[in-house]
């Protein structure tokens, strides 16, 4: 296992191997599959999106495994400047498949809005897979979030009013 640190975010490189069968004889072959995980040690604003974007150029698959449309990461590239909230940074690379995992609080209208926004700015239509176990943020989650902010009137807890607090 190889560990690199970038500020308060960590990149962990994991290596796996497997063995293959050849007839009756079982032979062991080393095959290296490199997985790079970008994990934040704080509550955001650590540069995870920027690091993921930098690593994306060399990656085949980029997975967004958790979070929702309340947070975001800004990417500046040859296509322009983008604020992504749901989409993984890999959407800017033709060769990359972006996966939205089952831990994501998925707001479907936000997802389609982001896809349309990047495509309208000249980004090729991305290859995206969404887990069939991704949980859906419903309109009532957003309403509950907005109502709670109104109820607290000035003593708000700093919600983005995107439904994340009631969702979780």
Stretches with model-predicted labels:
Residues 33-168:
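Non-transmembrane, aqueous-exposed alpha-helical and coiled segments at domain scale
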Residues 2, 6, 10-22, 30:
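Short, positively charged and aromatic/hydrophobic N-terminal segments
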């Amino acid at each position: 296992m190889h560990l690199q640190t970038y500020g308060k975010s960590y990149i962990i490189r994991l290596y796996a191997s497997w063995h293959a069968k050849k007839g009756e004889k079982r032979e062991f072959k080393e095959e290296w599959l490199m997985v790079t995980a970008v994990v934040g040690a704080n509550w955001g604003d650590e540069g995870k999106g920027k690091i993921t974007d930098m690593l994306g150029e060399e990656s085949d698959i980029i997975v967004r495994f958790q979070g929702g449309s309340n947070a975001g990461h800004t990417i500046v590239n040859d296509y322009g400047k983008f604020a992504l909230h749901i989409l993984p940074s890999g959407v800017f690379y033709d060769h990359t498949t972006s996966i939205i995992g089952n831990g994501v609080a998925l707001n479907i209208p936000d997802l389609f809005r982001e896809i349309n926004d990047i495509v309208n700015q000249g980004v090729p239509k991305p290859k995206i897979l969404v887990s069939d176990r991704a949980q859906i943020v419903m309109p009532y989650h957003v309403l509950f979030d907005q109502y709670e902010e109104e109820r607290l009137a000035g003593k708000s807890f700093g919600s983005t009013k995107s439904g994340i607090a009631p969702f979780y």
